[in-house]
Amino acid sequence: MALRGQVLTPDDAGYADVRPAYNAMHPGSPAIVVVASGTADVIDAVNFAREHDLLVAVRGGGHSVAGLSSVDGGMLIDLAPMRGVDVDPEASIARVQGGALWGDVDRETQAFGLVAPGGVVSDTGVAGLALGGGEGWARRKYGLSCDNILSAQVVCADGKLRTASADTNSDLYWALRGGGGNFGVVTSLTFELHPMGPIVAFTGVFYPVADAAEVWRGFRDWSLTAPDEVSALCACTTLPAHDALPPEIHDTPFIVIGAVYSGDPDDGMKVMQPLRNLATPLVDISQPLPFVGVQAAFDPFFVRGTLRSYWKSMYINDITDDMIELLARKAAERPSMRTFAPITFLMGGAINRVDPEATAYSERSANYLLSIDGNWSDPAEDQKVISWVRDTWAEFAPYGTGGVYLNFRSLADESEDSDVENTFGDNMRRLSEVKAKYDPTNFFRRNNNITPTG
């Protein structure tokens, strides 16, 4: 391969620098790493891998908790140098390269008081998050990341670059919005932008774990009438000392409520005030803040490459009183300091106003998303934490809709977690047909895989 970017093997200087990924359990050991400088490099890499029968993993931001952004013994196509973000403020669109992080996008769009709905961690890759759904601080007002994709440039399994939009390859466009990395290497995405920021109302309040049931109940009750402008979450964890965190919570278990208002900051602080009075806080850092700062506020919770992680999720419609008691019990018995008792994301709003068949992402009725995030450091604790997450998920399963959020899916090859079909529901058949058209041999299978028909 004659590339403008780098080609690295395990014997090359620099290989060790690009090998690690988000989850320390899954660093991967690729035989070849292609550090792509542009679309031409991606095309050459795909053609080479196809001709030499190499299993391919694609890394945008490298934030896959399941380790899908690396591979053992195959080829890793690393898009890290491709981080360009072009904003057209008059048209309210942004063209984003496949290796960009959400922090890159926020910096460029916020210069114009605009936002592309992204995640809640600035270090997350844009493409991976958006292709799997994308649930961030603007989700209830402006929808998921995938709902705001206007077009994509995709290098497919045959090595051809295709544009996918509502008017061109519309079947591929439909599948990309929720179908993940099944259909090719996405080298760029064009997003619709919306007015938000540069200052937004932010709620960040930390309560004692002893008040978990009271706080979750208050969060539930408030969420029932919350306006679409508010996107919020409630969770329990413990964090070590960090300059970005208030000292009152260093090494102290807490329940945190995070919320952002997509509108006038003064109005937002009033609307979210009840979330600050659910119990006596350990500390309350709620205030109007720059949106770029809010996007980075949860970065210390999810530090790249330092933790071993195993997560499971589910969508639910209601938080019952019985479920609140279960949430509080799980908050008190977490198996490791950095494990999250279920993060409860408030969904609904604009998300649920999209027809389930309009995009591959089909969960359009749930009011909440639960994510049980096991995070730890010592490999000797692998089985303990993984078992706790699985058992906890099983206890909550009766409350679930049957679907999971695929971006929060771990160990994608384990049989008990093979829930892709349940998640896509009635869209699964159509996805398999699109897969057969653009990737009939399942060349791109290092993902939450969709099997091609035929």
Give the positions of each predicted feature:
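Soluble FAD-dependent oxygen oxidases
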Residues: 1-454
